[in-house]
Amino acid sequence: MSQRRRPGRRLLKALLPVALLLVLGVGAGLLFIVHTIARPVTHPYLVTPETFPAYSARGLRVSEERWANADGTEARGWLLRGAEGAPAVVLLHRYGADRSWLLNLGVKINEATNCTVLWPDLRGHGEKPKITSTTFGARETTDVAAAVAFLRQLKSRQGQRPLVGARFGFYGVELGAYAALAATASARPAGNAAESASEVRALVLDSVPASPDELLGHATRDRLGFDNGLLNLLTRGAARLYFLGRYENEDSCTLASRLTGQRVLLLSGQDAGKLRESTRALAQCFPASPPAGLQVDLPVTGFTASSATGEQGETYDRLVIEFFSQAFNEDSTPRR
């Protein structure tokens, strides 16, 4: 009997190194995929304040700003100052885009509301980013809080009083929407400016992923060109190893359930793909009061608004602008 088993043992010993190499190869391949999609393809900005004559003609002064994130890295963005004491709005782009995609919308918000507007580049995005990789919402959440802290310390042109009042708004698309939602839900009570976004009163969230895992799956599909359930599952595991504990996967519904008092508008449309359904489902997760506004049949969303022309693009922008205007006006009205 022992002699009959020897060929099987020999075969097992022969195949074991092959199997080990196969596992290592698959693991290395998965880590390479995560490494690749964590570094979005960057492009020259679609438009900048300097290259868009219409902004200069209207006397708009959009400045380049830098500030520190909570982990010591440097963030950057454009700033358009509003009226002293007015609210501020932070615009957060989607994965694979950059701040220039939202420049026109932000200028319109400033002109209509007199709000200060900040356009950050999220991690790994924009021309020649100093932070080369995204974390699919983990670090971006604290980066948004750091952006709010930066806005709080701005002074008026006279240098005496704060430029921004006590109210803030977030507009975000996909990755930006998740970061805005997570930053608001994770805000601590006012008192620690570097870590609190508790003064956020209005949120416009366009095409929100159900979780960072879903966002990771969309990024994998976009970069590799196909969608495979097994590959997505393996990539999620590889992401946890790749980011060494810095990858978080708190779902959007849990985050939404923690909001208290913010006005929320959820937007999406057919061009957002599966994110349309995750956005629709998210509407059920907010506290009963105030209810979330929901429009998921838009012909244009934050995915395509930057390139939309004519009435559809104007309709989308007007929807966002009117929401912020009403939210800030209602919030400032004394209650009896």
Where are these regions (language model features)?
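An N-terminal hydrophobic leader/cap segment in hydrolases
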Residues: 11-67
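Serine-hydrolase catalytic core
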Residues: 67, 76-78, 212, 237-335
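Short beta-strand element of the alpha/beta-hydrolase
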Residues: 86-94
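The serine-hydrolase catalytic nucleophile loop
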Residues: 95-108
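Conserved alpha/beta-hydrolase
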Residues: 110-129
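Alpha/beta-hydrolase active-site loop
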Residues: 134-162
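Alpha/beta-hydrolase fold nucleophile elbow
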Residues: 159-174
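Hydrolase active-site cap/lid region
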Residues: 185-245, 257
